[in-house]
Curated annotation (Swiss-Prot):
This is tRNA-specific 2-thiouridylase MnmA 1. The keyword rRNA-binding does not apply. Its main location: cytoplasm. It comes from Clostridium botulinum (strain Loch Maree / Type A3). Its EC number is 2.8.1.13. Keywords: ATP-binding, Cytoplasm, Disulfide bond, Nucleotide-binding, RNA-binding, Transferase, tRNA processing, tRNA-binding. The gene is mnmA1.
Length: 356
């Protein structure tokens, strides 16, 4: 009997080709677009935006073309609770969250998988660029064939339970090949541009988004230097992130950067580039893929943002399941709330949330 797979389809080229590849591999494929947009939002239509109304139309068209059933499933409440509310709360606390990682953890590989299992479906699949393999009795994640498109950074939270039930067929291919396949089989989305913005903030202005939704929460305050001297006024801490230089709305005669955000005093601390360079961080909420726990220090390559090349580091387990990360070289703008992710060559070791 054919194994069934529920494919999350965003209307983009990757998830479209993922559905096609799985059908070709002999699975019984069902396409689903997750409805996550909120009723009170004017969901801005933007080419490349994932899970918008036009994305549903694109996904449905692809499903018809490759001959699979297609549904739209409602994940609005789970998305608001786990992704949007968390996103807003983190910014209000002076941290910079990564909503795509949160969505993967709570929606795509949790709520979506729960729905699949309740329907008696064996697997879920996405268009992510990553390779899932089984080694001995454990599932592991390796970097995809296409290093530029590799998405393992956003997948470090996956559990063994989830990995056993997840398929990522695009990981074996380069992006150019995925577009080629889409063109060969006549998919209109073969040249659709990739979405790069946060799906629920298409203009990427997170400060404006939070201010519009919660006008009473966002208050003006002071820019200060490291000694606490007032340098000027800011429009609300949610508009700023560590390392930011542009958009401060104030001129200093020399480049000044956001080096800290103090939510208790509603202050944004400015400093020099040198103040942004550090070799150490503490991370919490750690998840490991090839093993359950880290018992002793380990040499890894680590990265503190999605687009970065990993740098040599040593990770050391400390109290409460947290980890100290010591980099060989100084890292610029280590940012609370972002994720630090660990690798050994092309093997994803795990990761966690930067605490300090």
């Amino acid at each position: 009997m054919k194994k069934k797979v529920l494919v999350g389809m965003s209307g983009g080229v990757d998830s479209s080709v993922a559905a096609y590849l799985l059908k070709e591999q002999g699975y019984e494929v069902i396409g689903v677009t997750m409805q996550i947009w909120q009723d009170d939002e004017e969901f801005i239509e933007k080419e490349g935006g994932c899970c918008s109304l036009s994305a549903v139309a694109d996904a449905r068209r692809v499903a018809n073309k490759i001959g699979i059933p297609f549904y739209v499933m409602n994940f609005k409440d789970a998305f608001k609770r786990n992704v949007i509310d968390y996103f807003v709360d983190e910014y209000m606390e002076g941290r910079t969250p990564n909503p795509c990682i949160t969505c993967n953890k709570f929606i795509k590989f949790s709520s979506f998988l729960d729905k699949a299992m309740a329907m008696g479906i064996d697997y879920v699949a996405t268009g992510h660029y990553a390779i899932i393999e089984k080694h001995n009795d454990r599932y592991i994640i390796k970097k995809s064939e296409d290093d530029k498109k590799d998405q393992t950074y956003a997948l470090y939270n996956l559990t063994q339970f989830q990995l056993e039930r997840t398929l990522m067929p695009c990981g074996q291919y380069k992006k150019s090949k995925i577009r080629e396949i889409a063109k060969e089989i006549g998919l209109r989305v073969h040249n659709k541009k990739d979405s790069e913005e946060i799906c629920f903030i298409p203009d990427n202005d997170h400060g404006r988004y939070i201010k519009n939704r919660f006008p009473n929460k966002v208050r003006e305050g002071n820019f200060v230097d490291k000694q606490g001297n007032v340098l000027g006024r800011h429009k609300g801490i949610v508009y700023y992130t560590i390392g930011q230089r542009k958009g401060l709305g104030i001129a200093f005669g020399k480049p000044m950067y956001v080096v800290d955000i103090n939510p208790f005093r509603n202050e944004v601390v400015l400093g020099d580039l040198e103040d942004l360079l550090n070799t150490e961080l503490i991370a919490k909420d750690i998840n490991y893929i090839p093993f359950d726990t880290l018992k002793e220090p380990m040499e890894v390559e680590a990265k503190i943002r999605y687009s970065q090349t990993p740098s040599k580091a040593i990770i050391t387990p400390i109290e409460d399941g947290r980890v100290r990360v010591n980099f060989q070289e100084k890292q610029r703008a280590i940012t609370k709330g972002q994720s630090v992710v660990f690798y050994k060559d092309d093997l994803l070791i795990g990761g966690g949330i930067i605490e300090k």
